[in-house]
Amino acid sequence: MGVNDLWQILEPVKQHIHLQDLSGKTIAVDLSLWVCEAQTVKKMIGTVKKPHLRNLFFRISYLTQMNVKLVFVMEGEPPMLKADVISKRTQTRYGPSGKSRSQKTGRSHFKSVLRECLEMLECLGMPWVQAAGEAEAMCAYLNASGHVDGCLTNDGDAFLYGAQTVYRNFTMNTKDPHVDCYTISSIKSKLGLDRDALVGLAVLLGCDYLPKGVPGVGKEQALKLLQIFKGQSLLQRFNQWIEDPCYSVPQSAPKKVVHCSVCSHPGSPKDHERNGCILCKSDKYCEPHDYDYLCPCEWHQTDHNRHLSEIENNIKKKACSCEGFPFHEVIQEFLLNKNKMLKPITYQRPDLLLFQRFTVQKMEWPSHYACEKLLVLLTRYDMIERKHGRKTSNQLQPIRIVKPRVRNGVHCLEIEWEKPEHYVVEDGDPGKLSLLTMEEASLFEAAYPDAVAVYQKQLSETKGRKQKSMKNKPKGSHLPEADDVINSQSLMTLKPTSKAFPKQNPKINLENSPDPILAQESTSPSLNSFVSPENAPCLNLQEQLVPSPRTLAIKQSKDVSHFLVSECSQPSSSSHDISVITDLQLSTIDWAGTSFSNSPAVQRNTFSQDLASESESSAILPDFEQLSYESEQGTSDSEGSGRDLQQSNPEEQLLSGISALHLHDLPLKERIRIKSSCPQYNVGADAGLESLPLKLKGSCIAYSSSDGSSNFSKDLTGVYLHKESRNSKVLDSRLQENCGANTSLPYSFSDKAVKTSSLQVGLPTAAIPHNPRVAVKTTKNLVMKNSVCLERDSSDEDNAPGSWKSKYTAPEMKHSSQKHSLVHVRDSTHNKLRNPKVESKETKLCNESFKTAEDEENGFSDLGRSPQSFRPCHDKDENSTASWENPLPLRQRLKLRFQNTQSGFYNT
């Protein structure tokens, strides 16, 4: 128990110490303290056999792994002064005994418990010492003599016995394992209390040998008494009280004078304001002081001494009235040393076999569990011995270092050990020969340097192999450097195709196609180079000006791609255009070939026909223009040879393949229309197309292509072939006349080619209004491009506005006029070759048409549904630019330009 209220008095000097801070220190442990703490834990009572033994073992194991050396102190015979206290404690723990016995100081039951603890300490090799009397007295002796660095006890009597450092409130909490530390040096410096003062407090306040102390004297009065003596020995003062029991008579106090309320010195504030203060050494006014300031005047000094004497007289009166005061026996118990060292403190190696037997008998632990728990103490003891150079044959030998570990911020190593002698393994795993423990890295390296050297060598070799494997490992995700990309691009060339139109029978594409949509999509893309309505004149002009068509094709493709990007980046662009371009599936098209026989089927597009045609024309035509250049270079070595073109004319090949089809292969709509258009031929369901006239063959092709969800004619928006077959001759003549007046055709056609087909040249994709009679088309065997536009029903002709029908009616013309028009076109081409200025101007206008293509598409996307009237332009100054920048459709602009040319010719 110690001195009453001692720990409250020493509270200002308490220090919170982590258990790791005790590493390397030797601590004397009061064994009885740990036993009493284990017996008071209610959770262990009834669940754990011998809780004091279990508590003792795990505390030893925990502190030993922290490199804390322990020396246990065994209780001796208590002094007779403690008999009363011991009897009261026994009654409190075990209840009253029924018989009246003389007071004894024996601890028979407690000593039996302590003997069990000593047996365990023998098994673990822990040193212990026997105290002559109290255990804390022996701990203090060991600490004062330098055998240990501190005392681990909760009794404050250790300071009275001469201890220098005391640790109390030992806690193994995982969150904060700590102890409270008190040192005699801090107590003396901060509180002014030495060993004599602490013994005097034990007499006044009470202790184990004097439980009540001096009645009526408490902690506050005792501390005030110590302040009165100002460093004088309290024990000597006790002796003076006994020698002079008479109380000191207080001196007569002088008369109190007036004191200043500012400086607390004699005199009034007004006097100090006028004449100043002598004690403050000021001429006027005075210096203020705090509340605790004591005035040095005679009256205050006399009053203070009188007050202190009253406190001392009060305690002296109570102490002298107490029988046996000043209790010299108690003072001698604390001051006189009875303990001595009988043998040196030594640590022994834990005995594995003895510990197994002890735990099985006392604690009922299985042998394998006891061996597992004792292994850490065995390994640590052997490492410490080897560190100091004491090597024996029975020490544990490590097999290998498994891996490095960290425990409580300390670098450790996981070690695999050989199985020691008498080590028992669990029955379920008899083949386990190696054991694993975690040891401090520095200690293991000092004990087994060879094993650490081998481990480090293995680590370096493993690291070297990893570095070599990393160097030799190919980098799969390595990106090419900029120089490699530039070199690879420099080796790339745009090679022309060897054949523009391989001699393949398009009949296969139509016959093998399971549905008419696929058959329509399988037409050769190279035909589009002849029927591109926008770019044919421009391509021809640029081909004549630039000698290398491949270089020009590359430049033109870049310009068109830039135009497409800028067009797609406009905020007003509809999401329908994006979906239409996505449906094209351009990545699956074999652009190098001449047949789209393997092109996948394209889903029907449910968006607006005009919007789809605009997006398709802007996205596909530039690629087809480049293909036209490549096909032109591959098929003709000399410019202007029309023979090869006629031989590889895809329209004739397509007609030759379609002629083998039967009428029942066509949709019902076309069959009804053919029968109604040619009643004189008496067309049957199984009749072939060979018997039909050439005009009907072309219309059949146009109708079959327009009914598909992805037909060729919808790629050239404004060319609606399934409605304009009746105006074919008039249209062809007008187109040929317009082309002859404005542009030069890239190829020359023979009469035979003119009879079978007519080309559309110079018509914009989205600029022609949806007129069933005047809309531009080819009436004869015309092959159209792939498209994802919606199909156009033939019934739209009946739904067309009546004003359009009456406004754009024109008489039909014969084929002779078509021949004359083509001859006129050849002449105009020859004239333009001689006049490069005109061609360059036309080329410039052609390039400008690319820039205004988006505006034309946005402005005339709905012309097929809401026709508009256009204002013709007859000014001569605007002939060159107005025809290209004018928002009118290209057909109207060509017509106006043709009229202006004729009017100018007549005027001249």
UniProtKB/Swiss-Prot annotation:
CDD domains: PIN_GEN1. The keyword Chloroplast does not apply. GO terms for biological process: double-strand break repair via homologous recombination; positive regulation of mitotic cell cycle spindle assembly checkpoint; regulation of centrosome duplication; replication fork processing; resolution of DNA recombination intermediates; resolution of mitotic recombination intermediates. It is found in: Nucleus. Residues 460-482, 629-650, 792-834, 853-886 are annotated as: Disordered. Residues 465-476 have a biased composition (Basic residues). Its EC number is 3.1.-.-. InterPro entries: 5-3_exonuclease_C_sf (IPR036279), GEN_chromo (IPR041012), HhH2 (IPR008918), PIN-like_dom_sf (IPR029060), XPG-I_dom (IPR006086), XPG/Rad2 (IPR006084), XPG_DNA_repair_N (IPR006085). Its cofactor is Mg(2+). Mg(2+) 1 binds at residues 30, 75, 134, 136. Binds 2 magnesium ions per subunit. They probably participate in the reaction catalyzed by the enzyme. May bind an additional third magnesium ion after substrate binding. Mg(2+) 2 binds at residues 155, 157, 208. SUPFAM superfamilies: 5' to 3' exonuclease, C-terminal subdomain, PIN domain-like. Expressed in bone marrow and testis and to a lesser extent in thymus, spleen, brain and colon. GO terms for cellular component: centrosome; nucleus. Belongs to the XPG/RAD2 endonuclease family. GEN subfamily. Endonuclease which resolves Holliday junctions (HJs) by the introduction of symmetrically related cuts across the junction point, to produce nicked duplex products in which the nicks can be readily ligated. Four-way DNA intermediates, also known as Holliday junctions, are formed during homologous recombination and DNA repair, and their resolution is necessary for proper chromosome segregation. Cleaves HJs by a nick and counter-nick mechanism involving dual coordinated incisions that lead to the formation of ligatable nicked duplex products. PANTHER family: FLAP ENDONUCLEASE FAMILY MEMBER, FLAP ENDONUCLEASE GEN HOMOLOG 1. XPG-N, XPG-I,5'-3' exonuclease domains interact with DNA. Contains a chromodomain that acts as additional DNA interaction site and is required for efficient DNA recognition and cleavage. Largely monomeric, dimerizes on the Holliday junction and the first nick occurs upon dimerization at the junction. This is Flap endonuclease GEN homolog 1.
